[in-house]
Curated annotation (Swiss-Prot):
Keyword field: Cytoplasm, Hydrolase, RNA-binding, tRNA-binding
Gene (name only): pth
Function: Hydrolyzes ribosome-free peptidyl-tRNAs (with 1 or more amino acids incorporated), which drop off the ribosome during protein synthesis, or as a result of ribosome stalling.
Record site: Discriminates between blocked and unblocked aminoacyl-tRNA: 11
Record protein name field: Peptidyl-tRNA hydrolase
Length: 193
């Protein structure tokens, strides 16, 4: 199976642009920049969209412009329009259980308390069989501080580590286009130990 849609989960607007919760959108923006693709706000897909032409394949990009807890609406809208199956989707999102500088590809699984993922699973018909790119942001150490933590900007040192993980993830995504998903997963997991 090949990836046909890459989504960076996000909250909308400048207020949230640089927050930890939006690191998935940082990844999609970096990927678009590397391939010289402009993302355009498309209201029918509830987000910024564009596509990459890789050989004979077209891979769609999406950054939702609705709040994180409803990002699944945007994913479902574009997937339905282009007839993209859940297993052909890669969702990039922030991961509290990983330290900054760490990222991992994963296939399937639960939402782990991430409301954006929870909505994606729900909107895809309670189907969790899609790929994820989990980008580490760290944990505040107290579950009562999580909401404020994810909606804050990372410290400068954390930002550098997160950006490094995103850069490596984008390189490995390019390997996925050239080789296959298994190869990209192996490379990313080898680079970011």
């Amino acid at each position: 199976m090949t990836i046909k849609l890459i989504v960076g989960l996000a909250n909308p607007g400048n207020k949230y642009l640089l927050t930890r919760h939006n690191v998935g959108s940082w990844y999609v923006n970096q990927l678009a920049n590397n391939y010289h693709v402009s993302l355009i706000n498309k209201s029918s897909f509830l987000g910024y969209t564009g596509y990459l032409n890789i050989g004979k394949r077209r891979i769609f990009l999406l950054i939702p412009t609705i709040f994180m807890n409803y990002n699944g609406q945007a994913v479902a809208a574009i997937a339905k329009f282009y007839n993209i199956m859940p297993e052909e989707i890669l969702i990039a999102h922030d991961e509290l259980n990983f330290l900054p500088g760490y990222a991992r590809f994963k296939y399937s699984g639960g939402h782990g308390g991430h409301n954006g993922l929870k909505d994606v699973i729900y909107r895809l018909g309670d189907n969790n069989n899609f790929y994820r790119l989990r980008i580490g942001i760290g944990h505040p150490g107290d579950k009562n501080k999580v909401i404020k933590f994810v909606l804050d900007t990372p410290l400068d040192t954390e930002q550098q580590l997160i950006q490094h993980a995103i850069n490596e993830s984008v390189l490995c995504t390019s390997l996925m286009f050239q080789q296959n998903i298994a190869y990209a997963i192996h490379q990313l997991h080898t680079i970011l130990k």
